[in-house]
């Protein structure tokens, strides 16, 4: 996500306050997460966020030549591979799954400590959308929801403890709600921001007040964010509906611009009184 903020600035003459990156490709040698993109954004006055589409081996026998995936087979679709990787097994010391998550967490810890050493606080959204459709007669979408709510919560706490035990203390934790997944919530002590995804909004720039109010009632002690959307909420609509999300983020191309969020929208949005920008 190195070009979207500049494209928005070109249209609106202001930068958004927050830039969100993804550790999805941390294994790929041609992507240097130690590079200064996030650092320069921070030095320019911006806020830094990271999500992590945590891919694990597809093959149950850990033949790494078969590749990696974060999708479960039921959600992978015909063009992608799925994995049956088990969170329960990953939490059992000494298993291949446990060794895999330790290798991955070790790599991510090095990156997070690098940012911490540069004085960068990170809005951190790992293990997102864990419940998927589990509470609506379907299944989870990603492997971290593969074994249900209790295993997910244990994995979330395991990851959090691992990072803290290894000196990572610059993270603001974001948990994504599906609105009907209270039993998947790790708990107030382990979450800073409760978040929501919203798609199929029909380009109306509403404040999504119904969803905001549901989350506000369920999690009264937490800040609320709209972390993925196709159509951004309008600034005036959020004020009118008393549904002021902490931040909102369109899910990259094609939703940053196009029919969902036009250059004219971005100019009006970033020049609205209640909206903070990097500038």
Task: Locate predicted features.
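Alpha-helical scaffolding within the catalytic cores
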Residues: 2-8, 33-36, 108-111, 176-185, ...
């Amino acid at each position: 996500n190195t070009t979207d903020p500049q494209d928005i600035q070109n249209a609106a003459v202001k930068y958004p306050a927050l830039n969100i990156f993804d550790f999805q490709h941390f294994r790929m040698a041609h992507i240097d997460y130690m590079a200064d993109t996030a650092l320069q954004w921070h030095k320019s006055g911006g806020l830094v966020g990271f999500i992590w589409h945590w891919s694990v081996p597809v093959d149950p026998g850990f033949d790494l030549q078969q590749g990696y995936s974060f999708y479960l087979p039921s959600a992978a679709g015909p063009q992608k591979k799925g994995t049956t990787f088990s969170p329960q097994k990953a939490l059992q010391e000494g298993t291949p799954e446990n060794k895999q998550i330790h290798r991955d967490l070790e790599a991510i810890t090095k990156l997070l400590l690098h940012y911490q050493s540069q004085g960068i606080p990170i809005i951190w959204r790992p293990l997102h959308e864990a419940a998927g459709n589990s509470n609506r007669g379907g299944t989870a979408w990603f492997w971290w929801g593969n074994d249900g709510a209790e295993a997910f919560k244990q994995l979330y706490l395991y990851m959090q403890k691992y990072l803290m035990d290894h000196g990572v203390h610059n993270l603001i934790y974001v948990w994504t709600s599906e609105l009907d997944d209270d039993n998947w919530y790790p708990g107030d002590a382990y979450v800073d921001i409760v978040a929501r995804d919203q798609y199929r909004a029909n380009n109306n720039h509403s404040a999504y007040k119904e969803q905001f109010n549901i989350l506000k009632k369920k999690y009264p002690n937490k800040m609320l964010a709209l972390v993925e959307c196709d159509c951004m909420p309008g600034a005036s609509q959020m004020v009118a509906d008393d549904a002021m999300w902490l931040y909102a983020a369109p899910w990259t191309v094609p939703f940053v611009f196009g029919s969902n969020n036009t250059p004219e929208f971005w100019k009006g949005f970033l020049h609205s009184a209640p909206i903070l920008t990097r500038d």
